[in-house]
């Protein structure tokens, strides 16, 4: 009897155990598609990014015009650039849906997988931030100035740290060069961490909508979920191409079509849509250091999710109180995203402050209490 190379070859064996013969719960829904979509996004962003880097010049006198040159003169440069810019938006859309699924179905109880995933989110946010600076438009320049300046709120070492990151006394050529370096380097770090993320996941196997042990009912990943993932992939690419080909600048900022000018501040400095919720939390606190801490905590709170789980049940599927809180949290995040894009004036200030307090209250106080109440209702 001939041995199956797929199951014996050292390299093929790894791929086989991860993507072909992987035992998967039979009842995982479309919410479990986002992992593969994120992997696809990462590959797509890396490929388009490498092609852009071939034509980009990380110098303040050339950066803006090199991006214009890519979109005008390079073969399909407009397509590569628009796919890279909108691909980032789609990447974050998938990340947020993936995290939302993790919170709803209690996937955070796989602590190692959850912690590597949250670290991946932080790295992706850092990559997106330094990448946004590279076209050297007005919003790139002022976004870099405002966000890096937040570090000056750190007591004692703040100002030194900011100047160290800038490579001078303001955002200048040295800053752009190092941001380009980080933007090129970080995705490969993300890839390494993604492998760890999968490694930890395959130690435990996937969670499922019921939150119960599914060892008695597993099916092979291929063909069932490989085709299901392929459908998700086709839908995602359709959305990406629709954005890229019909509405390439829909999610961008018009200010970034103006070259960076240190002498003229844009009327409203705001980041890309996927950072607006955190930006709203930052702005809702009148104290600089307090704002920076709230901004950090808005993401780092995810690390606390396993410790805040009080329910006897894993998922939110059969927990009406927590369900109400979960969807309130989603609505609250949408409100924060809207507020982040609005000017700092009434009534937006107070709405932002209420939404920020609610965000932390739901995650840190109300959800654990709801879990305990639901436990009481069970007995």
Swiss-Prot record:
Record keywords: Electron transport, Heme, Iron, Membrane, Metal-binding, Mitochondrion, Mitochondrion inner membrane, Respiratory chain, Transmembrane, Transmembrane helix, Transport, Ubiquinone
Binding-site positions, a ubiquinone: 202
CDD domains: cytochrome_b_C, Cytochrome_b_N
Recorded superkingdom: Eukaryota
Chain coiled-coil ranges: none
GO cellular component: mitochondrial inner membrane; respiratory chain complex III
Residues bound to heme b b562: 84, 183
Cofactor mode of binding and number, as noted: Binds 2 heme b groups non-covalently.
Keyword Heme part of the UniProt annotation: yes
Disulfide linkage: none
Protein localization: Mitochondrion inner membrane
Keyword Aminoacyl-tRNA synthetase annotated: no
Protein family: Belongs to the cytochrome b family.
Job description of the protein: Component of the ubiquinol-cytochrome c reductase complex (complex III or cytochrome b-c1 complex) that is part of the mitochondrial respiratory chain. The b-c1 complex mediates electron transfer from ubiquinol to cytochrome c. Contributes to the generation of a proton gradient across the mitochondrial membrane that is then used for ATP synthesis.
Anything else known: Heme 1 (or BL or b562) is low-potential and absorbs at about 562 nm, and heme 2 (or BH or b566) is high-potential and absorbs at about 566 nm.
Oligomeric form and interacting partners: The cytochrome bc1 complex contains 3 respiratory subunits (MT-CYB, CYC1 and UQCRFS1), 2 core proteins (UQCRC1 and UQCRC2) and probably 6 low-molecular weight proteins.
Protein's recorded name: Cytochrome b
Organism in which the protein naturally occurs: Terrapene carolina (Eastern box turtle)
Organism classification: Eukaryota, Metazoa, Chordata, Craniata, Vertebrata
Gene: MT-CYB
């Amino acid at each position: 009897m001939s041995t199956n190379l797929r199951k014996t070859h050292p390299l093929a064996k790894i791929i086989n155990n991860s993507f072909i013969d992987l035992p998967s719960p039979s009842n995982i829904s479309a919410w479990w598609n986002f992992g593969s979509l994120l992997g696809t996004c990462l590959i797509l962003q890396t490929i388009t990014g490498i092609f852009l880097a071939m034509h980009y010049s990380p110098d303040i006198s050339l950066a803006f015009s090199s991006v214009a040159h890519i979109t005008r003169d390079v073969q399909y440069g407009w397509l590569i650039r628009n796919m890279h810019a909108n691909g980032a938006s789609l990447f974050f859309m998938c990340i947020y849906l993936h995290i939302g699924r993790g919170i709803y179905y209690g996937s955070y109880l796989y602590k190692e997988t959850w912690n590597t995933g949250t670290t991946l989110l932080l790295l992706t946010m850092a990559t997106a931030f330094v990448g946004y600076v590279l076209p050297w438009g007005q919003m790139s320049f002022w976004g870099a100035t405002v966000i890096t300046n937040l570090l000056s709120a750190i007591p004692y070492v703040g100002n030194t740290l900011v100047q160290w990151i800038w490579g001078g006394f303001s955002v200048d050529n040295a800053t752009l060069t190092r941001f380009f370096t980080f933007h090129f380097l970080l995705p490969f770090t993300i890839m390494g961490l993604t492998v760890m993320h999968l490694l930890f996941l395959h130690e435990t196997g996937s969670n499922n909508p019921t939150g119960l042990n599914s060892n008695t009912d597993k099916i092979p990943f291929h063909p069932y979920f490989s085709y299901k993932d392929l459908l998700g992939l086709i839908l995602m690419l359709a959305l990406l191409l629709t954005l890229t080909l019909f509405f390439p600048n829909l999610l961008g900022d018009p200010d970034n079509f103006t070259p960076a000018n240190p002498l003229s501040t844009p009327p409203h400095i705001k980041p890309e849509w996927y950072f607006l919720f955190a930006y709203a939390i930052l702005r809702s606190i009148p104290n600089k250091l307090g704002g920076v801490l709230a901004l950090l905590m808005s993401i780092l709170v995810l690390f606390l999710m396993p410790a805040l789980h009080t329910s006897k049940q894993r998922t939110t599927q059969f927990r009406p109180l927590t369900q109400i809180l979960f969807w309130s949290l989603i609505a609250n995040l949408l409100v924060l995203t809207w507020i982040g894009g609005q000017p700092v004036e009434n009534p937006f200030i107070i709405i932002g402050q209420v939404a920020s307090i609610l965000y932390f209250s739901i995650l840190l106080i109300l959800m654990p209490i709801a879990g305990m109440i639901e436990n009481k209702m069970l007995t």
